[in-house]
């Protein structure tokens, strides 16, 4: 989508002009990954309008393959407006104009899952699921655990302003359970699912092989696990037992029905924040870049922090 940022601080009613740029969680991640040297293809729908032209050209300028972007002659390109963040309160105003947009018309019928599974990694966002029922159906199809799909990455990206029914954010939990790599902030897990703390989030999301919990200035924690083979049955009856979970930040494995977790935490970098827009997407891109390069968990988190710091200070 096209993003409009204010020329000066203040409420939307008082801002006289805006600067046009590009936005969108998935396209942000695509641009950062391409800048990091990866081959990236962005697949979406935009309007057959000037904003769509600007969006496609701008994303392609980062080296992203935009051949998978479809033009919709009947629906416009989505836009949103954002006010400057108040550094004292971290408050800002966001207004979306995405209802009825070209992207909101994405569905399993016009965005075939098999066409999206051609790469090594498929990155998705919970924002898309909030745009329409068709988009939600597409997201359900893409997170279904079926043979032949690529590694699926899912950033929860809870945006209350986009959900028509506030209780609908529970579907984000279902979508996350279908992914292999999941990104979620502690704050959004609390707001969307009433889950507090890393252990509670992992308990609710045991399925993903990699769960990245973002903790703002405190850093990030990643749970990684490999499935364990089924144990041989013990002879005779006996009580079931379970091992305690690991404390986030330690390297002690934690047992679960899905295998054993290794938990690693890395603190965030200290930077002077200029603009917080896009930092979460940059973090995800940095983590995924390191994942594609086969780096260990701590290095993946460090790459995420480095990319996020670059976004925060530009």
Region locations from a protein language model:
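Structural alpha-helical scaffold elements that stabilize or flank donor/cofactor-binding regions
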Residues: 114-115, 174-175, 204
